[in-house]
Amino acid sequence: MVNEHNVTLSNLIDFGLIKPNQEVKYSYRGVSYTGVILLNGEIHTNGVSFTNPTHWTRTISGNNCSGWGTVKLSGASGPPLLKLKREYLFRVGSTGKNKKKTQKQQQPQQPQPQPQPQQQQQQQQQQQQQQQQQQQPNNNDNDSESEIYKKSDTSETSDQDIDNDDDDAGGQSNNRTTTTTTTTTTTTTTNRQNSPQKKIPSTAITNPKEKKKEKKENILTKKKQQSLQYQQQLQLLQRQNSPPSVSPSSSTSTSSSTSSPASNQIFNSFGPNSQNHNQYGINYNSQQHQPQQYNNNNNNNNNNNNNNNNNNNNNNNNNNNNNNNNNNNNNNNNNNNNNNNSNNNNNNNNNNNNNININNNNNINNNNNINNNSNNQPNCCSPNSNCQYYGYNQQNPPKHQYPNNFLTDGHNPSPPIPVLPFTNQSQNQNQNQNQNQNQNQKSKSKSKSKSKFKSKSKSKSKSKS
């Protein structure tokens, strides 16, 4: 019967998996066999032969035994893809061709990146801040004005008007008129002196955070400029009251102070010859009150500088905190990515193991089918049948039966090659022997005839003499 197959012996020879005159080991229904591949692609063993290069066939004497079996070829060399698995299923009977079932590799499902909790918290905080900003009205200017004019009118107006940005927004005039309504309406006018600093033009900004930042920056710049003005005023007043020194540092400092236009304005506006020298309550005629006034001014300047430094330190601390938070977020992201990669690797390993288990299960099922088929057909390969070349009949096992783990265990020595039937090689040897025998017989007959001829000629010569 023809064992219809997808892979033929000729294909295996073409691929280089098997070669002519190569010993082949295979198993059928748990029984191991050995054979030799001939030049035409046939496999001959003791009682079992696979013939016909286009199909794997074997001759059955007796009933048709249907079932499944595996042929395992060992010692074959070829491409690595074909070299990994040398198991070929074949079917006994003429019911149809085998279709190879190729299992699709299950691609490991990549886990979808879940949003990180830190990013969600940041987004929620931003949304809450935006809602709070939308709910709060922008009453910064009104609040600043109300806080400013709660103070007494006798205090310095330059320190009071720092937090108000109305004059910066307009930038047209330095004179301001503000009205405060109480039980008795009073109008107070404050004149600002022309200051040498340049005013920063304010751009229209809709974001309230940026407005607050600009206000803080403007306040800081104003405080710095005022502190510089106070220091320059004090230096000028000290130079006027101190005797002239001969040191080169004093000469250079006076030259630098007189060269700048700002110092000239300050000197002219706050000097002893100016009209505004009584604005700060300084009496230049009395020597007793001058050092106290200077000390008070120094203290005020130091306080302003300290406030500026504190603000700068706060800003630096905020920046450092932000940087630390960013670094922590980056580290968390890296750790999450590493965990995801390790999970992917584990999934791949699990999938590979599952595939291996599935293949093993298929092989086990195939073996079970073999046993079931043999049991379902009691007439096939029964002890009374003529199936003498197969190993299903355990009562009468064949002489060439080997252990079941013959092919799977590569450490066992190969069994002896069984006696092969009459082949072309033995025919040629017999023919050569026959030819040699015939030639020897002919040569012997020729030598005998020659000796007979010589003896006859000798006898004739003797008779003539």
Swiss-Prot record:
Residues 156-169 have a biased composition (Acidic residues). Residues 264-294, 392-407 have a biased composition (Polar residues). The keyword S-adenosyl-L-methionine does not apply. The keyword Coiled coil applies. Residues 214-242 form a coiled coil. Residues 208-220 have a biased composition (Basic and acidic residues). Pfam families: RAMA. This is Putative uncharacterized protein DDB_G0272516.
